[in-house]
Amino acid sequence: FNNFAVFGVLASGIMIVMLAGGFDLSIGSISGLVGIVSAVLMMDKIGVPTPLIFVIAITIGCTVGLINGLIITKIGINPIITTLGTLAIIRGTCYFWANQNPRIYNMFIQGFGRKFIADIVPYTTVYIIVFFIILALILKFTRFGRNLYTIGGNETLARLAGIPVDRIKIITYVISGFFCAIAGLLLISQLGSGRPEYGTGAELEVLTIVVLGGVAVGGGKGNFLGVFIALLIIGSISNGMVMLDVPVFLRQVVKGALLVMVISIDALRNRRNLQLY
C-alpha cells in the first residue's frame, strides 16, 4: 500500500473536482513538476530550507490548479481540453529541468514517504486516512461540501439557487493542485530523485480508483469510503500483477480495460436512473 500512496493522495484532489462536475487530466504532470522542481531546489548548490521547499511545492501545485480553474470557468473551455493542454505544457516544463538530474539527500524529505510507525504502518497510509477523514467531514458537514454535490448534480439549478458556482469550481482545482504537490513530494521521497517522467500515466490509475469507488463521472455523487476501498482493490491488483511478473504491456491493457469497464458501468447506471424518472 505504501507504493500506491501517491495515487491515493491524487485521488483525494480529483474526487473533489469531479464531485462538482469537473475533470482534471493534469494531476500526474503537476505532481511530476512539483517533484523535480523541489528536488532541484534541494541540491547542495542551492540548498533551499526544507520548510520553504514545502511552501514552494504547495504554491506551484495550487497556482497551476488556479490557472486550470480560471481557464475553465472564466474562458469557458471544456475541462478535459484545458487540463489536457496544461498536461502537455507542464510535462514539457518538467523536461526543461531534466538536465539537473537531482538526487534526494534531504533526510526529512527521504523519510516523508518512506517511514513506518512501529515498523508496521507506513506514514503514507496515515496521510491518506487523515486526508480522507478531513475531506469526508467537509463534504458532510459544511456548506461548501453540500454545494459541491448540488453543482455536480445540476449546475443550472445551483446557479439559480445563488450558489457561487465558478468560485467553488476554481477552489476545487486549487485543492486538487494542493494534493498534487503533496503527491509530488511523496514521489521524490520514495524514488530518491527528481525525474521529468515522474507522474506519467497517473491519471489512468487515479481515474480508475475514483470511478470504481462510486464517484460519478458527471459529478454530484460519491464518497471517500468508496474511493478508499477502490484504492485497496486497485492496489492489490497492481501489486499482484507485479508479484506474478505480468509483462508491463499486459498490465497497461488490464488497467485500461478496467477503466473502460468502470466508466461503462457508471454510464449504464446513470442511464437507468434517467429512465426511472
Predicted regions and their residues:
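Helix-loop-helix "hairpin" substructures at the membrane interface of multi-pass membrane proteins
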Residues: P49-A57, T63-N68, A118-G194
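Transmembrane helix-bundle core of multi-pass membrane transporters
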Residues: I75, P79-F144, I168-I171, Q190-G199, ...
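Hydrophobic alpha-helical transmembrane segments
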Residues: F7-G8, S29-L33, P51-T59, I81, ...
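Transmembrane alpha-helical segments in multi-pass inner-membrane proteins
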Residues: C180, Q190-G256
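Cytosolic-side transmembrane-helix boundaries in multi-pass membrane proteins
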Residues: R159-R167, M241-Y277
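Membrane-interface helix caps of multi-pass small-molecule transporters
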Residues: I16, V40, K45, L66-I75, ...
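Hydrophobic core segments of alpha-helical transmembrane domains in multi-pass membrane transport
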Residues: G13-M15, I58-G61, L87-G92, Y127-I138, ...
